[in-house]
Regions:
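Canonical Radical SAM [4Fe-4S] cluster-binding loop centered on the CxxxCxxC motif
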Residues: 1-10
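Short, ordered loop/turn segments at secondary-structure junctions
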Residues: 32-34, 166, 246
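Terminal RNA-binding accessory module
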Residues: 176-274
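Conserved SAM/AdoMet-binding glycine-rich loop
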Residues: 20-146, 154
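Conserved, mostly hydrophobic/aromatic
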Residues: 12, 29, 64, 92, ...
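Radical SAM enzyme [4Fe-4S]-AdoMet core and its adjacent flexible, acidic
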Residues: 38-55, 105, 168-199
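Short acidic/polar active-site loop segments enriched in Thr and Asp
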Residues: 25, 60, 159, 164, ...
């Protein structure tokens, strides 16, 4: 609560070095809004500078999460493109795609600006993974507002998406708005949105068949089947890849995997040299 407070880069880099020495392979940078990191200390946001410093520590993966769209700058995108160990993964909570609802939510962005951000990222990093979250059933959301959201999702074909129904909280600005929707309508809209994204997810996954990905092994199903993640997926919230291997793999290993099968959300493959 209260204003954003940033730790200075030096202290964060020192902590990161200790984590690296302790054997950490994936470093995750997260805050209420990582895109404004350093604004209170340096007079302007400096997430790009922090990421550049972290990239020198030689983690296998560095992932930054929860950056508001208005804070994603060309400088940040360029740093991600520059370093192989910074995951080309952008977690951008867009919340909605109707300008009217975005305004009611007090968001500092618009549908066109959201599209421009996605286009900027993809023009610089064509294979970037873009993750977002949307809220359906916000007070005052009309049928046409929801259709705008559906249209945006179908147009942009975002790689990863989480969605939630609006949940009323007392004494919040949204609670005082008119036009609260019944739970049945909110649930119907959520189900439709998720079905649209499910089709998109499977379509994007099928394009990965035959490609090779660096995979972090995280669990074992049986003697020859493991569960892992590519850099396209954050832990717990995204998809997994099932890895078939005749050789024994250890949890925490990085291996190269050829994608053989694609499902609605997950993938399946085998070791490159299996």
């Amino acid at each position: 609560r209260g204003k954003y407070r940033s730790r200075d880069i030096e202290s964060l880099l020192e902590e990161a070095k200790k984590l690296k020495e302790a054997g950490v392979k994936e470093l995750v940078v997260i805050a209420q809004d990582t895109s404004v990191y350093g604004r209170d200390l340096y007079g302007k946001p400096n997430l790009a500078g922090l990421l550049e410093g972290l990239a020198q520590i030689d983690f296998d993966w560095i992932r930054f999460m929860y950056s508001y769209p208005e804070g994603i700058s060309q400088e940040i995108v360029d740093v991600v493109a520059k370093y192989d160990n910074i995951c080309s993964y952008f977690d951008i909570p867009m919340q909605h795609a109707s300008d009217r609802i975005l305004k009611l939510m007090n968001r500092k962005t618009s549908r066109q600006e959201l599209k421009d951000k996605v286009d900027m990222i993809r023009s610089r990093i064509p294979d970037a993974t873009i993750r977002t979250t949307f809220i359906v059933g916000f007070p005052g959301e009309r049928d046409e507002d929801f259709e705008e959201l559906i249209d945006f999702v179908e147009e942009m074909k975002l790689d990863r998406m989480g969605a939630f129904t609006y949940s009323r909280e007392e004494d919040t600005p949204a609670d005082k708005l008119d036009g609260h929707l019944c739970q049945e309508i909110k649930d119907e809209r959520l189900q439709r949105l998720m079905m649209v994204q499910q089709v998109i997810s499977e379509e994007l996954n099928r394009k990965k068949i035959g490609k090779i990905f660096k995979v972090l092994i995280e669990d074992q199903v049986d003697d020859s089947l493991y569960i892992g993640r590519t850099q396209c997926d954050a832990e717990d919230i995204d998809s997994v890849i099932y890895v078939e291997s005749r050789q024994n793999l250890e949890i925490g290993d990085f291996v190269n995997v050829v994608v053989k099968e694609a499902f609605e959300y997950d993938l399946k493959g085998c070791l490159e040299d299996n």
